[in-house]
Amino acid sequence: MNDKRLRRRSQYRVATVGLALLGLLAGSGFAAENKLSQKSGKVLMPIGDATEAMDTLYPFFRLAEEGYEVVVAGPETRLYHMVLHEVPPNSDVPWDITREMPGYHIKAVVAFRDVKPEEYVGLFLSGGRAPEYLRYDKDLMRITKHFVKENKPIAVVCHGIEIIAAAGGLQGGRRATTVGKCELDIAQTGGVYVNEPWVVDGNLVSAGTWHNYDTPFFKTFVHKMRESAVR
Protein backbone atom coordinates (compact mmCIF):
# COMPACT_ATOMS: atom_id res chain seq x y z
CA MET A 1 0.00 0.00 0.00
CA ASN A 2 1.58 3.33 -1.05
CA ASP A 3 2.09 6.37 1.23
CA LYS A 4 -0.64 8.39 -0.47
CA ARG A 5 -3.29 5.75 0.25
CA LEU A 6 -2.09 5.42 3.85
CA ARG A 7 -2.36 9.18 4.38
CA ARG A 8 -5.84 9.15 2.85
CA ARG A 9 -6.98 6.38 5.20
CA SER A 10 -5.48 8.19 8.18
CA GLN A 11 -7.27 11.42 7.26
CA TYR A 12 -10.55 9.53 6.89
CA ARG A 13 -10.15 7.96 10.34
CA VAL A 14 -9.42 11.36 11.93
CA ALA A 15 -12.45 12.94 10.24
CA THR A 16 -14.68 10.03 11.28
CA VAL A 17 -13.53 10.18 14.90
CA GLY A 18 -14.01 13.95 14.93
CA LEU A 19 -17.60 13.71 13.68
CA ALA A 20 -18.34 10.90 16.12
CA LEU A 21 -17.00 12.99 19.00
CA LEU A 22 -19.15 15.97 18.01
CA GLY A 23 -22.21 13.72 17.87
CA LEU A 24 -21.35 12.23 21.25
CA LEU A 25 -21.07 15.67 22.83
CA ALA A 26 -24.38 16.77 21.38
CA GLY A 27 -26.08 13.50 22.29
CA SER A 28 -24.81 13.37 25.84
CA GLY A 29 -26.01 16.86 26.68
CA PHE A 30 -22.42 17.70 27.69
CA ALA A 31 -23.22 15.75 30.85
CA ALA A 32 -19.85 16.14 32.57
CA GLU A 33 -19.86 19.93 32.26
CA ASN A 34 -23.51 20.19 33.14
CA LYS A 35 -23.00 18.41 36.45
CA LEU A 36 -20.72 21.28 37.38
CA SER A 37 -23.09 23.96 36.08
CA GLN A 38 -26.34 23.12 37.80
CA LYS A 39 -25.90 26.13 40.11
CA SER A 40 -27.01 28.34 37.20
CA GLY A 41 -30.13 26.30 36.47
CA LYS A 42 -31.52 24.38 33.53
CA VAL A 43 -32.57 25.68 30.12
CA LEU A 44 -35.07 23.61 28.14
CA MET A 45 -34.45 23.19 24.41
CA PRO A 46 -37.34 21.47 22.56
CA ILE A 47 -36.35 19.82 19.26
CA GLY A 48 -37.67 17.35 16.69
CA ASP A 49 -36.77 15.94 13.31
CA ALA A 50 -35.80 18.75 10.90
CA THR A 51 -34.64 21.08 13.66
CA GLU A 52 -32.11 23.50 12.12
CA ALA A 53 -28.54 22.58 13.09
CA MET A 54 -26.98 26.04 13.43
CA ASP A 55 -30.07 27.41 15.21
CA THR A 56 -29.69 24.64 17.77
CA LEU A 57 -26.05 23.65 18.26
CA TYR A 58 -24.63 27.13 18.82
CA PRO A 59 -26.98 27.94 21.74
CA PHE A 60 -26.56 24.38 23.04
CA PHE A 61 -22.84 25.00 23.63
CA ARG A 62 -23.02 28.77 24.18
CA LEU A 63 -25.45 28.52 27.10
CA ALA A 64 -23.41 25.69 28.63
CA GLU A 65 -20.42 28.06 28.61
CA GLU A 66 -22.51 30.46 30.69
CA GLY A 67 -22.98 27.75 33.31
CA TYR A 68 -26.44 26.49 32.34
CA GLU A 69 -27.48 22.88 31.88
CA VAL A 70 -29.10 22.72 28.46
CA VAL A 71 -31.67 19.91 28.44
CA VAL A 72 -32.75 18.74 24.99
CA ALA A 73 -36.37 17.54 24.90
CA GLY A 74 -38.37 15.91 22.11
CA PRO A 75 -41.60 14.03 21.46
CA GLU A 76 -39.69 10.91 22.56
CA THR A 77 -36.24 10.20 24.02
CA ARG A 78 -34.21 9.28 20.93
CA LEU A 79 -31.82 10.66 18.33
CA TYR A 80 -33.28 13.29 16.00
CA HIS A 81 -32.19 14.41 12.54
CA MET A 82 -31.15 18.03 12.24
CA VAL A 83 -31.09 19.87 8.91
CA LEU A 84 -29.26 22.81 7.33
CA HIS A 85 -31.36 25.60 5.86
CA GLU A 86 -29.78 28.04 3.44
CA VAL A 87 -30.77 30.13 0.45
CA PRO A 88 -28.05 29.14 -2.07
CA PRO A 89 -25.92 32.26 -2.63
CA ASN A 90 -24.80 31.27 -6.13
CA SER A 91 -27.39 29.37 -8.13
CA ASP A 92 -28.05 29.28 -11.86
CA VAL A 93 -31.76 29.16 -11.04
CA PRO A 94 -32.70 31.54 -8.17
CA TRP A 95 -34.26 30.21 -4.95
CA ASP A 96 -37.03 32.15 -3.22
CA ILE A 97 -36.89 29.99 -0.08
CA THR A 98 -34.29 28.03 1.86
CA ARG A 99 -32.88 24.80 0.52
CA GLU A 100 -32.78 21.94 3.04
CA MET A 101 -29.81 19.60 3.48
CA PRO A 102 -29.10 16.83 6.02
CA GLY A 103 -27.28 17.95 9.17
CA TYR A 104 -26.01 16.39 12.39
CA HIS A 105 -28.00 14.30 14.88
CA ILE A 106 -28.88 15.29 18.42
CA LYS A 107 -30.42 13.26 21.24
CA ALA A 108 -33.46 14.26 23.23
CA VAL A 109 -32.79 13.15 26.80
CA VAL A 110 -36.36 13.73 28.00
CA ALA A 111 -39.78 13.43 26.35
CA PHE A 112 -42.14 16.41 26.38
CA ARG A 113 -44.68 14.49 28.47
CA ASP A 114 -42.11 14.02 31.25
CA VAL A 115 -40.91 17.63 31.40
CA LYS A 116 -41.66 19.54 34.61
CA PRO A 117 -41.35 23.14 33.40
CA GLU A 118 -41.12 24.54 36.92
CA GLU A 119 -37.63 22.99 37.12
CA TYR A 120 -36.30 25.22 34.31
CA VAL A 121 -35.13 28.82 34.38
CA GLY A 122 -35.36 29.43 30.63
CA LEU A 123 -36.77 28.14 27.35
CA PHE A 124 -34.91 28.20 24.01
CA LEU A 125 -37.00 27.63 20.87
CA SER A 126 -34.87 26.99 17.78
CA GLY A 127 -35.98 26.88 14.15
CA GLY A 128 -36.03 24.63 11.12
CA ARG A 129 -39.14 22.77 9.95
CA ALA A 130 -39.65 21.06 13.30
CA PRO A 131 -41.77 23.84 14.88
CA GLU A 132 -44.34 23.43 12.08
CA TYR A 133 -45.46 20.12 13.59
CA LEU A 134 -44.15 20.39 17.16
CA ARG A 135 -46.71 23.14 17.82
CA TYR A 136 -49.42 20.45 17.67
CA ASP A 137 -47.87 18.59 20.62
CA LYS A 138 -50.11 19.15 23.66
CA ASP A 139 -47.30 18.59 26.15
CA LEU A 140 -45.05 21.11 24.43
CA MET A 141 -47.92 23.60 24.52
CA ARG A 142 -48.34 22.91 28.25
CA ILE A 143 -44.63 23.57 28.77
CA THR A 144 -44.54 26.76 26.69
CA LYS A 145 -47.66 28.17 28.35
CA HIS A 146 -45.98 27.71 31.74
CA PHE A 147 -43.09 29.96 30.68
CA VAL A 148 -45.50 32.54 29.28
CA LYS A 149 -47.73 32.56 32.37
CA GLU A 150 -44.85 32.65 34.86
CA ASN A 151 -43.03 35.35 32.85
CA LYS A 152 -39.88 33.25 32.62
CA PRO A 153 -37.20 34.12 30.03
CA ILE A 154 -37.87 32.74 26.54
CA ALA A 155 -35.46 32.94 23.59
CA VAL A 156 -36.72 32.17 20.11
CA VAL A 157 -35.09 32.15 16.68
CA CYS A 158 -36.50 31.78 13.17
CA HIS A 159 -39.39 29.25 12.90
CA GLY A 160 -39.34 28.76 16.67
CA ILE A 161 -41.79 31.67 16.76
CA GLU A 162 -44.47 29.22 15.56
CA ILE A 163 -44.34 27.41 18.90
CA ILE A 164 -44.79 30.42 21.14
CA ALA A 165 -47.42 31.83 18.76
CA ALA A 166 -49.43 28.59 19.00
CA ALA A 167 -49.20 28.75 22.80
CA GLY A 168 -50.76 32.22 22.86
CA GLY A 169 -47.54 33.86 23.96
CA LEU A 170 -47.80 36.79 21.54
CA GLN A 171 -51.31 37.94 22.41
CA GLY A 172 -51.82 41.54 23.43
CA GLY A 173 -49.50 43.05 20.86
CA ARG A 174 -46.22 41.53 21.98
CA ARG A 175 -43.35 42.55 19.73
CA ALA A 176 -41.10 39.94 18.13
CA THR A 177 -39.03 39.23 15.06
CA THR A 178 -38.58 36.10 12.97
CA VAL A 179 -37.61 35.00 9.48
CA GLY A 180 -39.71 36.93 6.95
CA LYS A 181 -41.85 33.99 5.84
CA CYS A 182 -43.13 33.52 9.42
CA GLU A 183 -44.29 37.12 9.82
CA LEU A 184 -47.96 36.08 9.60
CA ASP A 185 -47.50 33.64 12.49
CA ILE A 186 -46.89 36.67 14.67
CA ALA A 187 -49.57 38.96 13.24
CA GLN A 188 -52.34 36.32 13.19
CA THR A 189 -51.84 35.36 16.85
CA GLY A 190 -52.05 38.86 18.33
CA GLY A 191 -48.41 39.91 18.11
CA VAL A 192 -46.57 42.67 16.27
CA TYR A 193 -43.86 41.74 13.78
CA VAL A 194 -40.76 43.94 13.99
CA ASN A 195 -38.38 43.86 11.02
CA GLU A 196 -35.18 43.98 13.07
CA PRO A 197 -32.33 41.47 13.61
CA TRP A 198 -33.36 40.94 17.23
CA VAL A 199 -36.11 42.23 19.51
CA VAL A 200 -36.80 42.28 23.26
CA ASP A 201 -40.29 42.48 24.74
CA GLY A 202 -40.40 41.71 28.44
CA ASN A 203 -39.32 38.12 29.04
CA LEU A 204 -39.26 37.37 25.29
CA VAL A 205 -36.03 37.72 23.30
CA SER A 206 -36.29 36.93 19.58
CA ALA A 207 -33.85 36.77 16.66
CA GLY A 208 -34.67 36.58 12.97
CA THR A 209 -32.27 33.74 12.08
CA TRP A 210 -28.96 32.33 13.29
CA HIS A 211 -27.29 35.00 11.15
CA ASN A 212 -28.40 37.42 13.88
CA TYR A 213 -26.57 35.59 16.68
CA ASP A 214 -23.89 38.29 16.43
CA THR A 215 -26.26 40.75 18.15
CA PRO A 216 -26.78 41.09 21.96
CA PHE A 217 -29.43 38.33 21.62
CA PHE A 218 -27.63 35.76 23.81
CA LYS A 219 -26.25 38.25 26.32
CA THR A 220 -29.76 39.61 26.83
CA PHE A 221 -31.31 36.16 27.28
CA VAL A 222 -28.64 35.19 29.83
CA HIS A 223 -29.07 38.53 31.64
CA LYS A 224 -32.82 37.95 31.91
CA MET A 225 -32.30 34.45 33.32
CA ARG A 226 -29.91 35.80 35.93
CA GLU A 227 -32.30 38.60 36.81
CA SER A 228 -35.14 36.10 37.13
CA ALA A 229 -33.08 33.90 39.45
CA VAL A 230 -32.63 36.65 42.03
CA ARG A 231 -36.26 37.74 42.11
Predicted segments, located by residue:
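Extended, subdomain-level signal for the structured scaffold at the beginning of enzyme domains
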Residues: 31-150, 162-175, 183-231
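Bacterial N-terminal signal peptides that target proteins for export
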Residues: 4-16
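Active-site-adjacent substrate-recognition loops and nearby beta-strands
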Residues: 179
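Short, thiol/selenol-centered motifs that function as redox-active sites or metal-ligating centers
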Residues: 157-160
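ADP-ribose/adenylate-binding Rossmann-like module
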Residues: 153-155
